[in-house]
Amino acid sequence: MRKRISAIIMTLFMVLASCSNQLEAEKLAAESKNTFFDSLVKIGQGFQDIFGIFGNAIGDALGFNAVKSGDKKSKIGEHFKKIGDGLTTTKDKLNELSGEISEAKNANGSSIEAVKSAINSASDVFEQLITALTKLAGVAKEAGSTDIGDTASAAALARDKDGVEAIIAGIKAIIDVADKSGVNIEKGNAGGPVNAAANTDAPAALAANAAAGANSTAKLAAEVTKADPWAMIDKINSAKAAVGVQLDANTNYGAGELATGTPNQANGSKAATNADLAAAVALKAMAKGGKFSHAANEDGAVKAAAVSAVNKVLGVLDFIIRKTVSSNLDKIREAVKGIKYSEITETDATESGDAQPTTK
């Protein structure tokens, strides 16, 4: 009888112990999941903050109205710097988030690595954009206190070749990074050629070897107004600066040649397309040195054309940069969505791997 009672008591003890262990295990599992969810909330909040950081950092720096008539070329540099600073802040915050993700509790290791990989990839893209923007800002800063659309009632002067080449290279770099990030870079509508038949035609204000004729500046402004910004960017992306080129009247010149070639015709020189002419105006307005030409009392129209051309280029560049940033942040967001719960922590896995096998 005593043996029977002892057996019953032992059984009850084992059942109670088992229940207690099960409850403790369930409690630990619940705590682990709560810790995991808390980590997810923290990561999600940090990521949402980053989405707003870039927009807040650059504020109202929208390229289509970045500069106005009367502004100095240094203003263009300030615009590039502001966007570059915003990207730097975003990149730094991403790196902070990467550290927080590494500390996430009870998260599946492979899903965490996927997020960190996406962050590293985005940081690399942002660094390339920052480098390009820093160089562009430097070119504009070097141009200094000269008016955007600097002009004279005399022969036009070619722009600094090195400065124009640096602008072309910076824009190329941004487009290349964006293209590799899956951003659609449109070709736009380049329009037809712009002839230089008289000194009253639009090309005279850009590249005449004497004072441009009456109303040439108004015609130049009209050409810039109708130019497709995407086509202008495309022409800059494929532009080549002229090396010792004396511009003639009949060759179909591209944007880089029109901006840096030596004016050699009273009527200016023919532009291959409307977009080439407008892009050349932008390049000439952004780089150091050189002048546009105008008839008496028409300098205001030249400056308006230059400002419009610059704003079109900056506007499309800003759009491309924003799309590139958004594309890379979206990739991180998708990776964050894929973070999975794991009952095995990194410490557990390490301890398990370090355990020595028993021998008999």
Curated annotation (Swiss-Prot):
Oxidoreductase in keyword set: no
Any one of the GO CC terms: cell outer membrane
Lipidation (N-palmitoyl cysteine): C19
Secretion signal span: 1-18
Alphabetic keyword roster: Cell outer membrane, Lipoprotein, Membrane, Palmitate, Plasmid, Signal
Coiled coil residues, start to end: none
Superkingdom: Bacteria
Lipidation (S-diacylglycerol cysteine): C19
Membrane topology summary: Lipid-anchor
Matches recorded under InterPro entries: Borrelia_lipo
Pfam families: Lipoprotein_2
Compartment(s): Cell outer membrane
Family, similarity comment: Belongs to the variable large protein (Vlp) family. Beta subfamily.
Further facts: Genes for both Vlp and Vsp families are on (usually) unnamed linear plasmids in B.hermsii HS1.
Task of the protein: The Vlp and Vsp proteins are antigenically distinct proteins, only one vlp or vsp gene is transcriptionally active at any one time. Switching between these genes is a mechanism of host immune response evasion.
Protein name, UniProt field: Variable large protein 14
Organism: Borrelia hermsii
Gene: vlp14
